[in-house]
Amino acid sequence: MEYRIEHDSMGEMRVPADRLWAAQTQRSHENFRIGVDIETMPREITHAFGILKKAAALANAALKPEKMTQEKLKAICSACDEVISGELNSHFPLVVWQTGSGTQSNMNANEVIANRANQLAGARLCHPNDDINMSQSSNDTFPTAMHISAVLAIEDKLLPAVELLIGTFKRLEAENDDIVKSGRTHLQDATPIKFSQEISGWRASLERDAELLRMAVKPLHELALGGTAVGTGLNAPKGFSELVAAKVAELTGKPFVTAENKFHALTSKDELVFAHGAIKATACDMMKIANDVRWLASGPRDGLGEIHIPENEPGSSIMPGKVNPTQCEAVTMVAVQVMGNDVAVGMAASQGNFELNVFMPVAAYNFLQSARLLAEAIVSFNNNCAVGITANREKMHHNLYNSLMLVTALNPYIGYENAAKTAKKAFKDNISLKEACVSLGFLTAERFDEVFHPENMI
């Protein structure tokens, strides 16, 4: 491998000749061999850095035109566009497990953008610190990258996934509105319910989750950029905070604004905790929905067997013909991961000391993993399972009329205690509720038929 020599304030470093990063990135790459090539800084953060560095260059060009010349601006914006598009992903090698402020990742962005801008300009125009990092600090850029990436993850990935599954459940509701089945509480038989009503519970849960996500994402539109090192805005020109936030809003199409209090924006991660709570709530509902689906599909002969789900792949290496509810299992595992990530995000957010939180990379890593995994899991569950759910009408009818909890319909006619005696006798003697009720002398066969209509119990 060929190398070139780069330098920073600590001296010279050998850097691979074909890489755009420079000395500070190389130092971090060598000093933090933790999760290398596996737990790298999320690409969402890298792309967010491209957005905020472009926004900063545009703001600086307006406020400091003597320093951010049009020639520099053009080259920097072009380089940033390549970062945003992912073309330069291979030039961002750093791991999550680095400095807690994300300083090295900020410098990784500064170095790559500067070197790429210089390549595009055909001249050594741009300096990583003096130009790309102008009016900024790692302490306000990393929190800004966190918020940009979090907003994009929720609004552009997770919410569309949730809405997709909501649409599928709406269709299933309409298709199954004529089916009455046995309800269940405590994993025990309960009074009847329409299958469409059961599905409506799934759908309404996700609609509420979407509402919570939209509410929780709003505070993340506030950006720390302009607070610089400790929130005072040192070395940032007047008006920079407002202008750079407006530029980020233009570039993303999202209503980003400058944070009202930069001291809070640098040291507190409460908005991230709040938003991840909404992600966790969605994961909790997906856990419930997926579990319901696999319970209802259990069998095919010895389980509930009330619905059919798509058979996507063989389920066992030893039991021929076995097919498992794999999509349900995948989404429930993702839900568990999200719940674990919520603990990590909360713990990281609690570590803001004085003017800065220095657990930001781990908070961002877990937050973005949660949003990404859950969005992809929901889409997979929808496309490979939910869209193919069909009712086993015969089994639902059999289970409904075999349920002892239908005896609840007799309460108004024979009373609670006599209804309980009827259910117990039917179970003990393995006879129908009608046979038990008549043999106990509570109702005649004719009267039983008059008052006993499970379809009217919903």
Give the location of each predicted region:
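Conserved, well-structured ligand/cofactor-binding cores
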Residues: 1-458
